Amino acid sequence: MKALQEIYNLRKFNVNDLQSVMQINRSCLPENYTDFFFIDLYRRFPEAFIVAEENDQVVGYTMCRIEVGLSGLGLSGLVKKGHVVSVAVMPQHRRRGIGEALVTKAMEAMKLYNAKQCYLEVRISNDEAIGLYKKLGFEVTRTNHAYYADGEGAHVMTRKL
């Protein structure tokens, strides 16, 4: 099997990717965002908005933002932290390491913004994603019940950068 980088190209998002990313978001996730939301994150944190493409077609993405707040890992005071807002990979491209590569690249980008830790929310029923995030060093730091619009809860998963 060919190496991931030989099949898929990971690169920074650009505005020409917007429609493809929005389509992936709508196809893969129940949480959908407006075009303004995507563009706003891109403009504020361009290094942390990554797409995966195969043959010049976007097949996955992750977008993040940088926040200042209380540590989810017991550190005292306020810390700069990355927030993985959304990760999605088209179903026919899953289980090939794309999600792992996207999140890893996003974490590298968060360091460019001097983030010391990062976190994300994941549906408590999404065992596959939870397993991936644990593999990447995230740990469940709390659970928010009825977090999503449909009433499902979310695990907040956090890790140091």
List each language-model region with its residue ranges.
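Acetyl-CoA-dependent GNAT
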Residues: 2-4, 8, 12-92, 103-113, ...
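Conserved SAM-binding loop
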Residues: 10, 95, 121-122
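Conserved acetyl-CoA-binding loop-helix of GNAT-fold acetyltransferases
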Residues: 91-108, 127, 131-135
